[in-house]
């Protein structure tokens, strides 16, 4: 019996057509609302669902691309105490996230890939926006008088 999976299961991912025994389909998949039987109506719904998922994926990629451009245009300025050789403190992902939020850019703290910047001057921090997209944020650290 052919069924369309509604949710991910051990048999396959959501929105895929699989072939299972009628008993398994009736007693487990349909009962737990994990699948629906394959027929003309559900096949049309599946095509629409896949198109909708593809559209959403493209929109998300466009948003990520815009966010990357916005982040790469930005320069964050921080002040740290210290003298010529040593710096007291560091710029952490938490501080960077806070500054980005002030500028209206919201990213997850784990997306900011830094172990703490503790040198004066210009540095670049990678911000992982998706599995394929990484933005480089420019950070300038000056001496606090």
Curated annotation (Swiss-Prot):
Membrane spanning stretches = none
Statement: the UniProt record of this protein carries the keyword Ribosomal protein: yes
Q: Does the keyword rRNA-binding apply?
A: yes
User: In which family does this protein belong, per the annotation?
Assistant: Belongs to the bacterial ribosomal protein bL9 family.
Q: Which UniProt keywords apply?
A: Ribonucleoprotein, Ribosomal protein, RNA-binding, rRNA-binding
- The molecule here is called Large ribosomal subunit protein bL9
What PANTHER family would the database entry show? 50S RIBOSOMAL PROTEIN L9 (PTHR21368)
Q: Name one GO biological process term.
A: translation
Task: Give the source's domain of life in one word.
Answer: Bacteria
Lineage, broadest ranks: Bacteria, Bacillati, Mycoplasmatota, Mycoplasmoidales, Metamycoplasmataceae
The protein's matches in InterPro entries, at most eight in alphabetical order, are given as: Ribosomal_bL9 (IPR000244), Ribosomal_bL9/RNase_H1_N (IPR009027), Ribosomal_bL9_bac/chp (IPR020594), Ribosomal_bL9_C (IPR020069), Ribosomal_bL9_C_sf (IPR036791), Ribosomal_bL9_N (IPR020070), Ribosomal_bL9_N_sf (IPR036935)
Reported function: Binds to the 23S rRNA.
Cross-referenced SUPFAM superfamilies, in alphabetical order?
A: L9 N-domain-like (SSF55658), Ribosomal protein L9 C-domain (SSF55653)
Q: Which GO terms describe its molecular function?
A: rRNA binding; structural constituent of ribosome
One GO cellular component term of this record is:
ribosome
């Amino acid at each position: 019996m052919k069924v369309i999976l509604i949710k991910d299961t051990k048999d396959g991912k959501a929105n895929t057509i699989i072939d299972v025994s009628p008993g398994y389909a009736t007693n487990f998949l349909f009962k737990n609302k994990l699948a629906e039987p394959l027929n003309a109506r559900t096949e049309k719904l599946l095509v629409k669902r896949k198109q909708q998922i593809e559209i959403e994926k493209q929109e998300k990629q466009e948003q990520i691309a815009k966010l990357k451009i916005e982040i790469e245009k930005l320069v964050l300025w921080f002040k740290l105490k210290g003298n010529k050789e040593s710096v007291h403190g560091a710029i952490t992902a938490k501080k960077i996230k806070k500054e980005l939020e002030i500028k209206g850019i919201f990213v997850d703290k784990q997306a900011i890939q830094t172990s703490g910047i503790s040198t004066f001057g210009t540095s670049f921090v990678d911000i992982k926006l998706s599995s394929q997209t990484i933005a480089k944020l420019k950070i300038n650290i000056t001496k606090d008088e």
